């Protein structure tokens, strides 16, 4: 039942399969960068989750180092990424994962000679 004057809360994300070829592709900035939105919404337990995959051209970064309240997981699928978290720099390759806690300065860039492909999972309380 909806109470007059109150917005109805959005429905929780349903269980679903996501086929890679069906994901919408969006150009991201200039050059070869692009991203694929996978999902964005609230889970049944109340957490907001957003997942996207990005392709980044050799030598490029998606944006300057920054901070934000939400937390992120970054999973490298292809290429070599240089990840900086709180001033600590490491190179990560396929299968590697980085976790960025709330309000910690971070950034990443493709330091390889070919494209890098990675997935970002954003977690909001």
Describe every region a protein language model picked out.
Residues 69-81, 86:
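Glycine- and acidic-residue-biased ligand/ion/polar-headgroup-sensing regions
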Residues 51-55, 73, 97-99, 120:
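Conserved hydrophobic/aromatic beta-strand scaffold that supports enzyme active sites
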Residues 42-49, 69, 84, 104, ...:
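Mature, secreted membrane-active peptide modules
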């Amino acid at each position: 039942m909806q109470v007059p004057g109150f917005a109805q809360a959005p429905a929780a994300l349903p269980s679903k399969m996501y086929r890679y070829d069906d994901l919408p592709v969006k150009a991201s900035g200039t050059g070869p960068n692009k991203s694929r939105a996978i999902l964005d919404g609230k889970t049944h337990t109340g957490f907001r989750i957003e997942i996207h995959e990005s392709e980044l051209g050799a030598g490029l970064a998606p944006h300057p180092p920054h901070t934000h309240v939400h937390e992120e997981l970054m999973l490298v699928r292809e290429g070599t990424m240089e990840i900086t978290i709180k001033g600590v720099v490491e190179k990560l390759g396929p299968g590697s994962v980085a976790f960025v806690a709330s309000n910690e300065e971070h950034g990443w860039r493709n330091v390889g000679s070919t494209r890098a492909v990675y997935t970002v999972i954003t977690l909001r309380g």
